[in-house]
Amino acid sequence: MSDSLDNEEKPPAPPLRMNSNNRDSSALNHSSKPLPMAPEEKNKKARLRSIFPGGGDKTNKKKEKERPEISLPSDFEHTIHVGFDAVTGEFTPDLYGSQMCPGKLPEGIPEQWARLLQTSNITKLEQKKNPQAVLDVLKFYDSKETVNNQKYMSFTSGDKSAHGYIAAHQSNTKTASEPPLAPPVSEEEDEEEEEEEDDNEPPPVIAPRPEHTKSIYTRSVVESIASPAAPNKEDIPPSAENANSTTLYRNTDRQRKKSKMTDEEILEKLRSIVSVGDPKKKYTRFEKIGQGASGTVYTALDIATGQEVAIKQMNLQQQPKKELIINEILVMRENKNPNIVNYLDSYLVGDELWVVMEYLAGGSLTDVVTETCMDEGQIAAVCRECLQALDFLHSNQVIHRDIKSDNILLGMDGSVKLTDFGFCAQITPEQSKRSTMVGTPYWMAPEVVTRKAYGPKVDIWSLGIMAIEMVEGEPPYLNENPLRALYLIATNGTPELQNPERLSAVFRDFLNRCLEMDVDRRGSAKELLQHPFLKLAKPLSSLTPLIIAAKEAIKNSSR
């Protein structure tokens, strides 16, 4: 009798999404992002010789002295003129544009772009309706900048809660202004560094969401696209912003304005940032929770305080842009907040950089979004915490640029924290807009997709898309080919909900404020913190049953 009473007093289990038990266990290898191909040993040695000309044997030194120095061509441009024939619905050579450049023949759309377009599922009608948007997304997809900004590091084993820690600290941060002590790395210089990367290896395509996070209604992409590695660096000049014609510039072998930092200079700079001492004497009970391409993530206990932390151990020799790690550490060190997974400490241990971060055992919000159903009060609570983090970052001139459920970590107490500053940008009042294309496509703001100058409100758009994730289990257009998804983001405006009638009027208004196409009318983090929807927020402890239910569902599906 008492047992039956106890059972009646227990609250009902949180509702699970229909897809939680229909997953292929093989999908639980969370390698959602493709890893770059390992460069050939010969290429590695050649690159090292180019960076450290003093190295090598005496014979090579003698040959180097005998060889005359010939400078690289500078400011070389390959201009491509693309027009659009409204009658045939085809992209054609732009005869007018070619006349503007004497001696150049009209070329039309590059062959690799034509191949991308054929497999993109963008219909002829859509191409005819907005050819400029098509060119914008083709330029993005073909851009090496996008390839170099992919988060290559994804863990292959261990606790899924490691996800946010493994993705963080990638050497792909771009900063518009440098924090103290950091070497100046301008946007243009960073792009030139990317051009020097080995072009022989094919770039990875934009990875769709892992199969286990898709709903039962999600169609797989019909055909994967192999993105050609074309060094496409210059933004479309204002004079060429025309719906029927655009001039695109391909720069090759541009002369470097400033040389890269040497390994010794990078180590010297890191020594001025990191703590002195042996971290093995400060932390104990190391437990591996994840493995990535350039490092390993462990949990450990701080001996003095008993605090559980996450420690990422990165082999510096395997980091493609070691100098940018400095910028990221400084940005994170200077921006601490209760709603951010905070940087705690760092150490140099031999050839490794150890970065110590807060540890949240609840895992990423993606687990909760894909495995359970959240109500509006719980969604409001998550949105409030994220907006508090964004308000703090934006007030400190930092744009996150990759807001999505994967980058929100949860504590078992329901705490909500923003992580992964691999794409973050620091801006100044003098340079309050940026125009680089970074982030994850399905969460991107339209102004980012179309390569316009943008500000902190790109994070607000992404937050709105993440709110849709919390309602529907996935972002809009996830079932589309990535290239077509970019086109739809650029042209459709605010995405439509599957069942808007199920949402309250105040929630729909909140989404509309986040997903406003007109950036000036889109709410800021500070403004949205006053939105009536956030008054519906439940206590953060209401997220704990969802976190437990998500972990249980993942555990059961892996059996």
From Swiss-Prot:
Q: Where in the numbering of this chain does the Protein kinase domain appear?
A: 283-534
EC number in record: 2.7.11.1
Segments for region (Linker)? 84-282
An example GO biological process term is:
axonogenesis
**GO molecular function list:** ATP binding; MAP kinase kinase activity; metal ion binding; protein kinase activity; protein serine kinase activity; protein serine/threonine kinase activity; SH3 domain binding; small GTPase binding
Region feature Disordered, mapped onto this chain: 1-70, 171-215
Effect of substituting H78L: When expressed in hippocampal neurons, strongly decreases the number of dendritic spines
Q: What happens when the gene is disrupted?
A: Mice show significant abnormalities in synaptic plasticity as well as deficiencies in learning and memory. Pak1 and Pak3 double knockout mice display reduced brains characterized by simplified neuronal dendrites/axons and reduced synapse density.
Q: Which domain of life, per UniProt?
A: Eukaryota
Which keywords are on file for this protein? Allosteric enzyme, ATP-binding, Cytoplasm, Developmental protein, Kinase, Magnesium, Metal-binding, Nucleotide-binding, Phosphoprotein, Serine/threonine-protein kinase, SH3-binding, Transferase, Ubl conjugation
Binding-site residues for ATP, renumbered to this chain: I289, G290, Q291, G292, A293, S294, G295, T296, V297, K312
Q: Which residues carry this modification: Phosphoserine?
A: S2, S4, S50, S154, S186
Q: Where does the record place the region Autoregulatory region?
A: 65-150
- Effect ascribed to mutating K312R: When expressed in hippocampal neurons, decreases the number of dendritic spines. Strong decrease in the number of dendritic spines
What PROSITE patterns has UniProt attached to this entry? CRIB, PROTEIN_KINASE_ATP, PROTEIN_KINASE_DOM, PROTEIN_KINASE_ST
Catalytic activity annotated for this protein? L-seryl-[protein] + ATP = O-phospho-L-seryl-[protein] + ADP + H(+); L-threonyl-[protein] + ATP = O-phospho-L-threonyl-[protein] + ADP + H(+)
Annotated CRIB domain ranges read 70-83
GO CC annotation terms, alphabetical: cytosol; glutamatergic synapse; postsynaptic density
UniProt-listed Pfam families: PBD, Pkinase
Its subcellular locations are: Cytoplasm
Task: Provide the active-site residues from the annotation.
Answer: D402 (proton acceptor)
Q: Could you describe the subunit structure of this protein?
A: Interacts tightly with GTP-bound but not GDP-bound CDC42/p21 and RAC1. Shows highly specific binding to the SH3 domains of phospholipase C-gamma and of adapter protein NCK. Interacts with the C-terminal of APP. Interacts with ARHGEF6 and ARHGEF7. Interacts with GIT1 and GIT2.
Q: Tell me which family the UniProt entry assigns to this protein.
A: Belongs to the protein kinase superfamily. STE Ser/Thr protein kinase family. STE20 subfamily.
Protein name according to UniProt: Serine/threonine-protein kinase PAK 3
Organism this protein belongs to: Mus musculus
> What is the primary gene name for this protein?
Pak3
